[in-house]
Regions:
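Surface-exposed loop/turn motifs in large extracellular/passenger domains
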Residues: 2-455
Length: 455
């Protein structure tokens, strides 16, 4: 087929679209059931593949297996079909996902097992996705873009993704202006509200390559990637999503040749929100997926968060592998970058953190901490194997301090327990203090890390 069953639809329940069907849409907005649902969808399953292609997409692309625009609740709905959107040259804003391209309602008890992918040579400007302005391509296992206003609020609960989620640009050096941030996430590409008790098992893959393999530093081409969500860049106020009780077990592989500005990659969330004191929190989340960074990208990568945000009782067990990239990149078992007084409490940083090329900071808890006042880190545990990086910007708790002037205290009420190894040296009670933090910008009395040996 080439068109949805309906343009707009009310309540639909107990429906299966069989795998013998296939859809090749001719319009840039598509969902098998409808362009938009204004009534609830319940117990609807799609098994059919959707393939959308063009030489170039000049208009916004919104494609979900069931609906393009989810404007009412979606419950117990499932997709096993592959969703493929391809532009031979360029595309602008795009929302590609396993259930709904855009969601301004509650989605719960839903799943995706299909491969979800969007690819183009380069991004040629931005588009409006329903009511979200200046959008870039976003790909999500279940949802690509979220909406949030007085008419409806994005929320995703008890959902699972098992399919590969893929975002590819093959010629980013063809862009002529800064590109808004592209998102890719196992559950949601660009969230705009709470995500609760969701689980990702599929690979999250992003490739933003230049045509000749060289670093592109003239224009921005940023990617935000996370096992659960890319993050809140397009959310209301750029800070809307609490992520609670979620797990990622899928590998996250990011290749990029964009080196002008920081991309952000996290096992749970890439970019938690704007770089300020935040009101949202990533809580009770676990990452078990390995994260691999390559290309010439400038990146902040961490097992739970790539960029800065609040974290409570989160754990990373996956390996962070920096194969190659820009020397200004930072990586950490828990988070790549942390700043603005956001809090990290009762979190656990396990796994391996490996830099196979030069980085600006490598840490167990935090790769790089900003020059902003902090009092946090209470009850945290670090048991990492750290390899690579320079001694001056490497540490079990903090790799690099960005400045010398702001008071930073970690583990004041409950010291941080540290163990593991650094550059092949096993940490013990006699030597742990030598490996707690890097020396760059460290200022005694201003920077205080209360740590003890132990697990």
């Amino acid at each position: 087929g080439t068109a949805p069953l309906f343009t707009e639809v009310g309540t639909v329940k107990d429906l299966v679209i069989d795998a013998s069907c296939s859809f090749v849409p001719t319009a840039s907005e598509f969902g098998i059931i409808a362009i938009r649902n204004k009534g609830e969808l319940t117990n609807v399953t799609n098994k059919a593949n959707i393939t959308m292609s063009a030489d170039a997409f000049d208009d916004a692309v919104i494609c979900g297996a069931l609906v393009a625009e989810g404007l009412a609740d979606i419950t117990d709905c499932h997709n096993t079909g592959n969703i493929t959107v391809t532009a031979q040259t360029s595309m602008k804003g795009a929302a590609v996902a396993g259930i709904a391209g855009y969601l301004k309602a509650t989605m719960k008890d839903c799943s995706n097992e299909g491969t979800i992918s969007a690819s183009c040579a380069f991004v040629n400007g931005a588009s409006t996705i329903v009511d979200v302005k200046n959008c870039a391509p976003s790909v999500g296992g279940l949802v690509a873009y979220g909406g949030n206003d007085e008419n409806g609020q994005f929320a995703v609960k008890n959902c699972v993704n098992k399919g590969k989620v893929s975002l590819v640009n093959t010629s980013i050096d063809s862009v002529t202006e800064n590109v808004k941030r592209q998102d890719v996430g196992g559950i949601a590409g660009a969230s705009n509200g709470d995500i609760t008790n969701c689980h990702n098992y599929g690979e999250v893959y992003a490739k933003l390559a230049s045509s000749n393999g060289s670093a592109m530093s003239g224009n921005e081409a940023i990617v935000l990637a996370g096992g659960i969500t890319g993050g809140d860049y397009f959310a209301v106020g750029q800070i809307k999503s609490n992520i609670t009780g979620c797990t990622n077990e899928g590998p996250i592989n990011v290749f990029s040749d964009a080196s002008k500005s920081n991309s952000a990659v996290g096992g749970i969330v890439g970019w938690p929100g704007k770089e300020a004191k935040q009101s949202t929190c990533t809580k009770d989340c676990v990452n078990k997926g390995d994260i691999t960074i390559s290309g010439t990208v400038k990146v902040r990568a961490g097992g739970v968060q790539g960029g800065t945000g609040n974290m409570d009782n989160c754990t990373n067990e996956g390996e962070i592998i920096f194969e190659s990239g820009d020397k200004a990149s930072v990586i950490g078992s828990l988070c790549g970058f942390h700043s603005q007084g956001n809090t990290i409490e009762t979190c656990k940083a396990f796994g391996k953190v490996t830099a196979m090329a030069t980085v600006d900071g490598i840490g167990g808890l935090i790769g790089n901490i900003g020059n902003a006042a902090h009092n946090t880190g209470n009850g945290c545990v670090v048991d990492c194997v750290i390899s690579g990086g320079a001694e001056a910007t490497r540490g079990l708790v903090i790799g690099k301090f960005n400045g010398k002037t702001k008071n930073i205290t970690l583990g004041e009420t409950s010291p941080i327990k540290v163990s593991g190894s650094v550059e092949g040296t096993k940490i013990d009670a006699g030597n742990f203090a030598n490996f707690v933090h890097g020396t760059t910008n460290y200022t005694e009395g201003v920077h205080v890390i209360n740590a003890v040996f132990g697990k």
